[in-house]
C-alpha cells in the first residue's frame, strides 16, 4: 500500500511507513469504490495472484491498474487491453507482441514483462511498478528538462535500444510517455507494443504506419521498413521536446504531422531557446536528419555523444556515472 503522507510504497503487512514512520491505514478501512466491469474482470482473470488497488489511467489501447503481487508483496502495474479491442485480431496481435518482445529482452533499462494472460476477453500483461513517473510528467511539470538530466536519461534508453536492435527488434513508438524512471532516477524504456523485427512486414494488414506521428521518423511515416536509426530519430525528438518543451512538428491531424516529418526541416532548439547549448543542439539535430545514413549509425553512438556532452559539463559527476554505467552494463559487439 502507499503511505498517505509521503507516497512511499510499503508492504501490505506494514503498520507504519518505512520512510516517514506515519501510521498506515488498515486495508479494510481504506476508501473503496464499487469496482467497474474492467476491475471485476481483471480480478476474475488473475485470481488471488494480485490484489488490484486502483486504476492509474487509460490509454488508447489499455487501462492501467496498480496492484500488489500477493506472494511477493511488491507493487506491479497491470495493463488490460480494452474489451472492445480484445475482439480485434490486429490489436490482440499487437498486445501479444508487446509481451513477447519485452520477454525476449533482458536489460536493466528495459521494463520487463513479469506475467501475461487471457481470460475470455480480458487480456493483460504485468510489469514492475516504477515509482519515478515518466519523462512526459517531468516535461509537463517543469516545461523543459535540464539538458544533463535529459542526456543521462536518453543515453540510458539509447543503450537499451541498441541492445534490442542487435537482436533484430526496433521499438517504433519512442515518446516521453514510454520513458519511465525507477526510484533511483534511472530511465527505463517500456511499451514494445508495435516493436517488430527489422525485416518483417508491417503489423497492420492495411499497411498504415503504426506509432505516434509527433515522434515518427520520415521512413516510418511513409510506411517503409525501418531499422534502429528510426528509433534514433525518435530519441532526437524526445530530446528536442525535453530541451524546449514541445516536439519540432505539430499539426491538426496525424497526416499533417507525418507530412512535416518527411518534408520539413526542424528549427534548431538553440534557435528557439538560447539556454540550449550549441553542442546539445547539434546532437539533437543529427538525430533528426531526414536521411537515416546521416543520423548516428547506432543508438550506442548516440549514447556515446550524450556521455561526451555530460562529461563537458562541470559538476555533474552523478549523471555522468549513471550514463557510463548503463553504456557498459552489457557487452556490445562492434557493428557489423
For the regions a language model picked out, list residue spans one by one.
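Protein kinase catalytic-loop region centered on the HRD/HxD motif
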Residues: 159-169
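Activation segment signature within eukaryotic-like protein kinase domains
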Residues: 153-154
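Protein kinase glycine-rich loop
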Residues: 53-59, 64
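AlphaC helix of the eukaryotic protein kinase fold
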Residues: 82-104
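Activation-segment/catalytic-loop signature of the eukaryotic protein kinase fold
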Residues: 116
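Juxtacatalytic C-terminal regulatory tail of Ser/Thr protein kinases
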Residues: 25-38, 293, 297-336
Amino acid at each position: 500500500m502507499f503511505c498517505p503522507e509521503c507516497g512511499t510504497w510499503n508492504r501490505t503487512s506494514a503498520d507504519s511507513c518505512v520512510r516517514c514512520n506515519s501510521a498506515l491505514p488498515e486495508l479494510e478501512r481504506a476508501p473503496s469504490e464499487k469496482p467497474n466491469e474492467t476491475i471485476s474482470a481483471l480480478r476474475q482473470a488473475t485470481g488471488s495472484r494480485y490484489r488490484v488497488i486502483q486504476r492509474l489511467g487509460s490509454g488508447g489501447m489499455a487501462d492501467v491498474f496498480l496492484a500488489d503481487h500477493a506472494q511477493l508483496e511488491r507493487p506491479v502495474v497491470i495493463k488490460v487491453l480494452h474489451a472492445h479491442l480484445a475482439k480485434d485480431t490486429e490489436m490482440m496481435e499487437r498486445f501479444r507482441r508487446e509481451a513477447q518482445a519485452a520477454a525476449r529482452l533482458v536489460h536493466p533499462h528495459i521494463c520487463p514483462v513479469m506475467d501475461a494472460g487471457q481470460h475470455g476477453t480480458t487480456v493483460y500483461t504485468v510489469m514492475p511498478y516504477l515509482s519515478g513517473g515518466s519523462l512526459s510528467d517531468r516535461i509537463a511539470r517543469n516545461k523543459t528538462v535540464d539538458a544533463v538530466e535529459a542526456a543521462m536519461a536518453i543515453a540510458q534508453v539509447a543503450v537499451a535500444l541498441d541492445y534490442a536492435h542487435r537482436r533484430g527488434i526496433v521499438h517504433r513508438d519512442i515518446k516521453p510517455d514510454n520513458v519511465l524512471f525507477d526510484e533511483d532516477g534511472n530511465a527505463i524504456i517500456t511499451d514494445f507494443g508495435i516493436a517488430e523485427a527489422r525485416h518483417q512486414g508491417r503489423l497492420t494488414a492495411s499497411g498504415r504506419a503504426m506509432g505516434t506521428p509527433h515522434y515518427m521518423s520520415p521512413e516510418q511515416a511513409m510506411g517503409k521498413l525501418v531499422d534502429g536509426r528510426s528509433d534514433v530519430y525518435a530519441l532526437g525528438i524526445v530530446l528536442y521536446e525535453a530541451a524546449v518543451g514541445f516536439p519540432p512538428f505539430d499539426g491538426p491531424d496525424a497526416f499533417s504531422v507525418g507530412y512535416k516529418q518527411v518534408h520539413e526541416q526542424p528549427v534548431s532548439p538553440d534557435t528557439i531557446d538560447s539556454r540550449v547549448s550549441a553542442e546539445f543542439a547539434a546532437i539533437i539535430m543529427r538525430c533528426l536528419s531526414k536521411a537515416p545514413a546521416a543520423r548516428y549509425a547506432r543508438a550506442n553512438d548516440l549514447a556515446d555523444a550524450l556521455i561526451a556532452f555530460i562529461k563537458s559539463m562541470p559538476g555533474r559527476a552523478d549523471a555522468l556515472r549513471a550514463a557510463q554505467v548503463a553504456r557498459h552494463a552489457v557487452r556490445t559487439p562492434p557493428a557489423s
